[in-house]
A protein has these predicted regions:
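A short loop-to-beta-strand structural motif that recurs across blades of beta-propeller domains
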Residues: 41-43, 84-86, 171-173, 218-220, ...
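Asp-box/WD-like beta-propeller blade repeats and closely related beta-sheet repeat scaffolds
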Residues: 57-170, 184-187
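Short, conserved, GDST-rich strand-edge loop motifs in beta-rich repeat architectures
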Residues: 16-37, 78, 84-90, 95, ...
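Conserved beta-propeller blade repeats
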Residues: 2-15, 58-77, 113-134, 139, ...
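Multi-bladed beta-propeller domains
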Residues: 1, 35, 43-60, 90-120, ...
Length: 384
């Protein structure tokens, strides 16, 4: 859902914790729990050659986000007790790579600012289409009245639905990427996640009520000035919404799951909502007849799981619980079965499109029997 190609289209970004030589480190969570982990680093694939280039190092990398208009990358780092934002000059970095003289990160990174602790505990972020603001999710303390209201309104799942993430008072803040100044956008009374900014219209933000499973209202929309804050696609009790993606200028694509028998009593599949009119359109569903007799809880077959769309609204793509990747012509409804048996582990296929809409990119554990992921790409330029 975030930009993966550099602005000039010459490099593709991915993350990995297994390609480098980083040693396992231990950190302490806010609740005092100890956690061991191997640091994740950012890598780029040069599209013309297939060469893989490591772009970050060290144990303190947070999130990275490619700029929309120039070859830059915004990088957050946890340094001591501070959450710091930097911007990396990728043109300078790639030029040095070609000359075989890569410097330290400090040679390419410029400090932007430190997130103020009084504004909350920062998490994920997205960058506005003009590259001038980062919209950052936060957890916050709030008031006792807010906490009481949050618990009263918290989602109560069916017996076979997980709630892996407990409700938390949260919000969205914005950082000026020129000055480092941080200001409030909105406060929420649910765990706020999966934040995305429009790549086309400044100040439009989509985010979710993150439970790790179903929610009574998953998708939300707000503007960067905080004047608009509303549900996006008002759900019914049988809607299990997931994997929203701010794919195009006027449409947010998402999935309504159909993998449980009770969820099949109404339409499911890849859906899109028009941000200007709130009109909703079902794009398509597949594989619901597969494994109908499977043991309840088996995630095999049973329709789409994740989705994305090309920027011109011509194509939608989705992966299924069975590990297949499908392509749908949004205008005609014609479906193409692109890929089989991605294993959906150690992570899901998560198909997405190149900026020009001619290629579908996805992850696959097929060639490692689900032990490691390969990045795969299918050229769809000949598809009608």
């Amino acid at each position: 859902t975030d930009p993966m190609w550099t602005a000039d289209g010459k490099y593709l970004l991915f993350r990995s914790s297994s390609r480098g030589n980083d040693k396992e480190v231990e950190s302490t969570l806010p609740n005092g729990e100890k956690r061991k982990w191997t640091p994740t680093q950012i890598y780029f694939i040069e599209m013309a050659t297939g060469k893989i280039i490591q772009a970050t190092e060290g144990p303190n990398l947070g999130s990275a986000f490619l700029a929309n208009k120039t070859n830059r990358m915004f990088v957050s780092r946890k340094e001591k007790e501070n959450w710091n934002m930097y911007v990396m000059d990728l043109d300078k970095f790639f030029a040095d790579v070609k000359q075989g003289k890569i410097g330290k990160p400090s040679a390419y990174e410029t400090f932007i600012g430190t997130f103020p602790t009084e504004m909350g505990r920062p998490g994920g972020y997205a960058v506005d289409c003009n590259d001038d603001y980062a919209y950052i999710t936060v957890e916050r303390e709030g008031t006792e009245e807010e906490k009481e209201r949050m618990m009263k309104n918290a989602f109560l799942p069916e017996s076979n639905q997980p709630v892996k993430i407990k409700p938390t008072l949260c919000g969205i803040r914005k950082m000026n990427l020129s000055t480092g100044e941080v200001t409030k956008v909105i406060d929420t009374e649910f765990k706020t996640g999966h934040i995305q900014a429009s790549r086309f219209t400044p100040g439009e933000i989509v985010f979710c009520n993150e439970t790790g499973g179903d929610a009574h209202q998953r998708m939300w929309f707000c503007t960067a000035d905080g004047t608009v804050f509303k549900p996006l696609y008002k759900e019914t009790p049988l809607d299990w919404v997931t994997h929203e993606t701010f794919a195009t200028k006027d449409f947010v694509y998402f999935n309504v799951l159909g993998f449980q028998p009770r969820l099949r009593k109404q339409a499911s599949g890849i859906v899109r909502i028009n941000l200007r009119t709130d009109d909703v359109e079902l794009i398509g569903q597949v594989e619901l007849e597969k494994d109908r007799q499977a043991i309840d809880g088996q995630l095999v077959g049973r329709g789409f799981w994740h989705c994305n769309a090309s920027r011109d609204n011509k194509w939608a793509a989705g992966d299924t619980f069975g590990g297949n990747v499908w392509l749908i012509n949004v205008q005609t409804g014609e479906r193409h079965w692109l890929v089989s048996d991605t294993k959906m582990k150690p992570d899901h296929a998560h198909p997405s499109f190149s900026p020009d809409g001619t290629k579908v990119l996805f992850q696959s554990g097929h060639f490692t029997n689900g032990k490691r992921l390969n990045l795969m790409m299918v050229d769809i330029s000949s598809f009608k």
